[in-house]
Amino acid sequence: METRSLYVHIPFCESICSYCDFCKVYYDQKQSDLYLQRLNEELSQIKQHHLKTIYIGGGTPSALNDEQLEKLMSMLKPYSLEVEEYCMEVNPESMDYYKLKILKKGGINRLSIGVQTFQDHLLKEIDRHH
């Protein structure tokens, strides 16, 4: 059997970093709700559920609110049953205890924490907040 992976792009950010070249837009609840609806429609077309990895990147996937994160985890559940690595990018500023619980319950077993620097003056220079 072929090794397969799934990348899910969540393009929403609470702020736009000057150095980032990835496809992103400012977080908007209505837009992100619609995006998740369309993502669910696309996922329903995937026949292959034997995935080795799932990677949720962005943008800032952790910019989604609790309800949206729960919906995302629910949508991906059928694809995550045999996954070895289930990763999501997060920004320290947009994470909290409840979001971590949602991700753990959803099966996430690896976080990619977007810490660019711990030095405040450098954060300011690159328009980064956390």
Where do the language-model regions lie?
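N-terminal [4Fe-4S]-dependent radical SAM core
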Residues: 1-7, 22, 48-50
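Alpha/beta-hydrolase
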Residues: 8-10, 115
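Conserved non-cysteine loop/helix-boundary elements of the Radical SAM core domain that shape
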Residues: 24-130
